[in-house]
């Protein structure tokens, strides 16, 4: 707490810092945490291979290539005609399969560590700074509104939670910035979203009865007297 108090951040610094953190938070939510973790994993594989950090992945790739080559060779011979050779290849394939599985488990553990690291970094970038701002700088006035710009009741709302009328604190500023950034992202991405089909209004279809059928049903039955006699 002494370190934070010693900083004594200027209101302008708080405005810019909170805006930056909220922008990063909105971008992370827009892109998706899982997508960022996947990009970080691919970056780790690309850079880690050159720096010797992702040895498990490199070894896994080589072992898989050897296993595919061995399986092709095993399928190319007959187990009955060349039983000894086929048995030897089969033992090698089983050994390589076990090694590939072990390396796959190591890669899964490495990926889990990368995902956890990305989660911690995102936490420090997007969540902890906001809590620090709310706890230690909640009583800081960021700026003052010119007199008469807004009605009195609007100034009182903007002064929430406990500032004088005409003041704007961190709570209202962060709420406004969050909504503005969210609206801007929506407007920028809305044209690229898939179009929604126009709903078709369902109309009641009445059954049309032919006129001949109507006349037959409505006309009385005529009995031929001559035929009856």
Swiss-Prot record:
<dbReference type="GO" id="GO:0000139">
    <property type="term" value="C:Golgi membrane"/>
</dbReference>
<feature type="topological domain" description="Lumenal">
    <location>
        <begin position="1"/>
        <end position="14"/>
    </location>
</feature>
<dbReference type="InterPro" id="IPR027538">
    <property type="entry name" value="Get1_fungi"/>
</dbReference>
<keyword id="KW-1133">Transmembrane helix</keyword>
<feature type="region of interest" description="Disordered">
    <location>
        <begin position="210"/>
        <end position="229"/>
    </location>
</feature>
<comment type="subunit">
    <text>Component of the Golgi to ER traffic (GET) complex, which is composed of GET1, GET2 and GET3. Within the complex, GET1 and GET2 form a heterotetramer which is stabilized by phosphatidylinositol binding and which binds to the GET3 homodimer.</text>
</comment>
<dbReference type="GO" id="GO:0005789">
    <property type="term" value="C:endoplasmic reticulum membrane"/>
</dbReference>
<feature type="coiled-coil region">
    <location>
        <begin position="60"/>
        <end position="117"/>
    </location>
</feature>
<feature type="transmembrane region" description="Helical">
    <location>
        <begin position="15"/>
        <end position="34"/>
    </location>
</feature>
<keyword id="KW-0256">Endoplasmic reticulum</keyword>
<keyword id="KW-0812">Transmembrane</keyword>
<feature type="topological domain" description="Lumenal">
    <location>
        <begin position="144"/>
        <end position="167"/>
    </location>
</feature>
<dbReference type="GO" id="GO:0016192">
    <property type="term" value="P:vesicle-mediated transport"/>
</dbReference>
<keyword id="KW-0813">Transport</keyword>
<dbReference type="InterPro" id="IPR029012">
    <property type="entry name" value="Helix_hairpin_bin_sf"/>
</dbReference>
<keyword id="KW-0931">ER-Golgi transport</keyword>
<keyword id="KW-0333">Golgi apparatus</keyword>
<dbReference type="GO" id="GO:0071816">
    <property type="term" value="P:tail-anchored membrane protein insertion into ER membrane"/>
</dbReference>
<feature type="compositionally biased region" description="Basic and acidic residues">
    <location>
        <begin position="210"/>
        <end position="219"/>
    </location>
</feature>
<dbReference type="GO" id="GO:0043495">
    <property type="term" value="F:protein-membrane adaptor activity"/>
</dbReference>
<feature type="transmembrane region" description="Helical">
    <location>
        <begin position="168"/>
        <end position="184"/>
    </location>
</feature>
<comment type="similarity">
    <text>Belongs to the WRB/GET1 family.</text>
</comment>
<feature type="transmembrane region" description="Helical">
    <location>
        <begin position="123"/>
        <end position="143"/>
    </location>
</feature>
<dbReference type="InterPro" id="IPR028945">
    <property type="entry name" value="Get1"/>
</dbReference>
<protein>
    <recommendedName>
        <fullName>Golgi to ER traffic protein 1</fullName>
    </recommendedName>
</protein>
<comment type="function">
    <text>Required for the post-translational delivery of tail-anchored (TA) proteins to the endoplasmic reticulum. Together with GET2, acts as a membrane receptor for soluble GET3, which recognizes and selectively binds the transmembrane domain of TA proteins in the cytosol. The GET complex cooperates with the HDEL receptor ERD2 to mediate the ATP-dependent retrieval of resident ER proteins that contain a C-terminal H-D-E-L retention signal from the Golgi to the ER.</text>
</comment>
<feature type="topological domain" description="Cytoplasmic">
    <location>
        <begin position="35"/>
        <end position="122"/>
    </location>
</feature>
<dbReference type="GO" id="GO:0043529">
    <property type="term" value="C:GET complex"/>
</dbReference>
<feature type="topological domain" description="Cytoplasmic">
    <location>
        <begin position="185"/>
        <end position="229"/>
    </location>
</feature>
<keyword id="KW-0472">Membrane</keyword>
<keyword id="KW-0175">Coiled coil</keyword>
<dbReference type="Pfam" id="PF04420">
    <property type="entry name" value="CHD5"/>
</dbReference>
């Amino acid at each position: 707490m002494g370190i934070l108090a010693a900083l004594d951040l200027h209101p302008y610094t708080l405005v810019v810092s909170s805006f930056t953190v909220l922008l990063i938070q909105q971008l992370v939510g827009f892109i998706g945490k899982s997508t960022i973790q996947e990009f970080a994993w691919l970056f780790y594989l690309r850079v880690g291979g050159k720096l010797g950090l992702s040895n498990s992945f490199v070894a896994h790739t080589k072992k898989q290539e050897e296993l595919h080559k061995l399986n092709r060779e095993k399928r190319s011979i007959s187990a009955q005609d060349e039983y000894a050779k086929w048995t030897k290849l089969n033992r090698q394939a089983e050994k390589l399969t076990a090694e590939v599985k072990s390396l796959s488990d190591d890669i899964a553990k490495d990926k889990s560590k990368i995902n956890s690291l990305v989660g911690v970094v995102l936490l420090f970038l997007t969540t902890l700074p906001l809590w620090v701002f709310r706890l230690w700088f909640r009583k800081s006035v960021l700026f003052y509104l010119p007199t008469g710009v807004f009605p009195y009741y609007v100034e009182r709302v903007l002064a929430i939670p406990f500032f004088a009328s005409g003041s704007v604190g961190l709570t209202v500023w962060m709420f406004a910035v969050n909504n503005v950034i969210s609206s801007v992202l929506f407007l920028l991405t809305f044209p690229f979203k898939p179009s929604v089909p126009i709903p078709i209004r369902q109309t009641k279809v009445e059954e049309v009865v032919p006129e001949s059928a109507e006349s037959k049903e409505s006309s009385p039955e005529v009995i031929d007297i001559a035929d009856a006699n």
